[in-house]
């Protein structure tokens, strides 16, 4: 409706609307009525808090309104009146209520607390619950903050392809894209699937990262970023992994690993601070009902410098500590979540950059250090989550990059265009990837990745 006011606007600019007629539209959260008057808590999704509507038997459809089930949609015209002695700061005294849509009486989200596991089974309705309406508003605000940060820094927003013929991570855990008949694909003389007959004429997959394409643009525009969906065919049924998730991937030219870490820290602090400023009600809800120490932790992150250690130093700390881990610690292993959380939660008690990882556990494009054992890579670890950002200085030396690819059995012809970047004005450059869902988990205190993405895609689950 043209003259409808958002509930958020009424809360944020109350003085503008007090004692004036307003029109709102939304869904009934609660309704209680007697023979002569009633109260409706209505929410339109724009704000965490509801607004109370008072109606009486002067309305021509009073009896019909009094019997409306929860989640019915209505439009209300009435006067906004201050209520200084009540629980809510104001209410709308209704002059007219229009029923937009009736809800069935078997609506699953009745007024009681539901488990997150149950709410995942009704993902099409869970945005209407308090926890998930708060989560997805925070997600929206955080996404905007990311764009705002990079645009203010002069970065160029770049769209990288979702369908790709390259494996950025070299891990092979990719979803295949094909139009070949799965029951009877055409075969080569050797009996292998003939991908030259496929739609793209070669093997193609859903992207695991936009980084390689992003480097092309960084070496033209200097500072760029991508923000889009990525896909991993990892059969990991954990609270931290999903098959489809969103990644933020900046690339900066004329930059080394130190520049990369400074950018990551500045971006993370900016986004968290922005969400704290824009979503105080949501974060207070999470602090009260999800994670009691959330606000204290977020304030600490924004106000303190991040720690930094090398991988070798981190391993030494873990080997010397008294804590028993499920996974043994030794130089050369990929740090597990329990190791990362010990470092951030018990030893440093703050976010931590770990740098200079063994080359064997990192990707081919990361710049080789002088020791020929480690690469100029970093992971940012945060309390409660573990790794949230992975980045590196990229290998700009063509001969070193080709040697590393040969060592890993990667075919140069599959990456010919990526290698050509090193022939035409190569320069040092760096970048990182931030898993957006893990960031939202950190900001909200939610502990399962399935609860911070609207319709999660995990092993065995593609519903909705």
Swiss-Prot record:
Main location: cytoplasm
Sorted UniProt keywords: Aminoacyl-tRNA synthetase, ATP-binding, Cytoplasm, Ligase, Nucleotide-binding, Protein biosynthesis
Principal EC category: ligase
Listed GO CC annotations: cytoplasm
PROSITE patterns (UniProt xref): AA_TRNA_LIGASE_II
EC number(s) given by UniProt: 6.1.1.22
Molecular-function GO terms, alphabetical: asparagine-tRNA ligase activity; ATP binding; catalytic activity, acting on a protein; nucleic acid binding; transferase activity
Catalytic activity: tRNA(Asn) + L-asparagine + ATP = L-asparaginyl-tRNA(Asn) + AMP + diphosphate + H(+)
Family the entry assigns: Belongs to the class-II aminoacyl-tRNA synthetase family.
Name this polypeptide is given: Asparagine--tRNA ligase
């Amino acid at each position: 409706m043209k003259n409808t006011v958002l509930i958020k606007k009424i809360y944020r600019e109350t003085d503008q609307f007090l004692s004036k007629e307003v029109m709102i539209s939304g869904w009934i959260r609660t309704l209680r009525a007697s023979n002569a008057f009633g109260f409706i808590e209505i929410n339109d999704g724009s704000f965490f808090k509801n607004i109370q509507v008072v109606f009486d038997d002067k309305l021509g459809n009073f009896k019909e309104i009094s019997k409306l089930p929860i989640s019915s949609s209505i439009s209300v015209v009435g006067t906004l009146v201050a209520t200084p002695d009540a629980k809510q700061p104001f209410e709308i005294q209704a002059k007219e209520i229009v029923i937009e849509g009736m809800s069935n009486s078997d609506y699953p989200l009745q007024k009681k607390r539901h488990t997150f596991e149950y709410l995942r089974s009704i993902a099409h309705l869970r945005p209407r619950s308090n926890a998930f309406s708060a989560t997805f508003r925070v997600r929206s605000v955080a996404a905007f903050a990311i764009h705002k940060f990079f645009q203010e820094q002069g970065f160029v927003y770049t769209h990288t392809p979702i369908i790709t013929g390259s494996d950025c991570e070299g891990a092979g855990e990719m979803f295949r894209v094909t139009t070949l008949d799965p029951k009877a694909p055409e075969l080569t003389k050797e009996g292998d699937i003939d991908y030259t007959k496929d739609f793209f004429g070669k093997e193609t997959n859903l992207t695991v990262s936009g980084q390689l394409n992003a480097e092309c643009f960084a070496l033209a525009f200097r500072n760029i970023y991508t923000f889009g969906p990525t896909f991993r065919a990892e059969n990991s049924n954990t609270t931290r992994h999903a098959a489809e998730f969103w990644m933020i991937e900046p690339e900066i030219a004329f930059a080394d690993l130190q520049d990369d870490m400074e950018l990551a820290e500045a971006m993370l602090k900016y986004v968290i601070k922005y969400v704290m400023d824009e979503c105080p009600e949501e974060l207070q809800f999470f602090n009260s009902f999800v994670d009691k120490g959330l606000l204290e932790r977020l304030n600490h992150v924004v106000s303190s410098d991040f720690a930094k250690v090398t991988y070798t130093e981190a391993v030494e700390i873990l080997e010397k500590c008294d804590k028993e881990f499920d996974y043994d610690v030794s130089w050369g292993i990929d740090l597990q979540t329990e190791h990362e959380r010990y470092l951030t939660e018990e030893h440093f008690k703050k976010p931590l950059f770990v740098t200079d990882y063994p080359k064997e556990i990192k990707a081919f494009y990361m710049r080789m250090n002088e020791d020929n054992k480690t690469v100029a890579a970093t992971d940012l670890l945060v309390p409660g989550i573990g790794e949230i950002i992975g980045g590196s200085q990229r290998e700009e030396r063509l001969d070193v990059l080709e040697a590393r690819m040969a060592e890993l059995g990667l075919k140069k012809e599959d990456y010919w265009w990526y290698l050509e970047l090193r022939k035409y004005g190569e320069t040092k450059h760096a970048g990182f990837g931030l898993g957006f869902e893990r960031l939202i988990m950190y900001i909200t205190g939610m502990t399962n990745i399935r609860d911070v993405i609207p319709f999660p895609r995990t092993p065995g689950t593609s519903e909705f």
